[in-house]
Amino acid sequence: MTPNPTPTQPSRRIAHLDMDAFYASVKLLRYPQLKGLPVVIGGSRRKMDEALQAREAGRDTADIPVDEFPRLRDYVGRGVITTATYPARQFGVGSAMGLMKAAKLCPQAILLPVDFDEVRRFSQQFKQIVTDIAPVMENRGIDEVYIDFTDVPGGQRESGLSLARLIQSSITQATGLTCSIGVAPNKLLAKMASEFKKPNGISIVQPEDLQSRIWPLPCRKINGICLLYTSPSPRDVEESRMPSSA
């Protein structure tokens, strides 16, 4: 008798989903007139924020003129940036940067406080959408998750691209927010891949892509690697690529 063939095990497909500039994007849903402008989110609530809130009374927030919003150049204090829109990032502004330092780089940026209640609400909403489609999810923060595509119907199609598109479009349709997704054989590579095509992108990394797409990246792109080790010598790079003798 001919033995029955051994069933082929599905390739492991892990996705990392990261919401794009999440805190800022939630704010832009309230103030769509700020889309495409440099906007910084951070610091505690200030008098200028209370003044903006007072101007909102009895009017559509989308109708507030852009020139009525607080500007980063007027900030004084020790607060730090929670996040910034992509137009603001083009000036070198980024998360965890002091607001006073950011004001020197992009003084014209609009400065708004975090709306924690809205952020939590949208966080719960996008995660519910994910688990409705792919139930095996690991929560990694308010704006990012890992998802196991391996055994999900459609999770192997196009190496996970089809399922990633479905999740991405479902989130955008329901919330108005965008996300970026990386799909790879493990969590480490998936997280790196989710950064490749931000914002609103999808990247697939296969084992055979390591040499061409992963090796050239600086060490700081590897999650968990010490930021102090960012400039390896050419010799270090070559030795790291040599096969182990063990």
Model-derived regions, located:
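Catalytic palm subdomain of template-directed nucleic-acid polymerases
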Residues: I147-R165
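Long, highly charged, low-complexity intrinsically disordered interaction regions
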Residues: S159, L163-P218
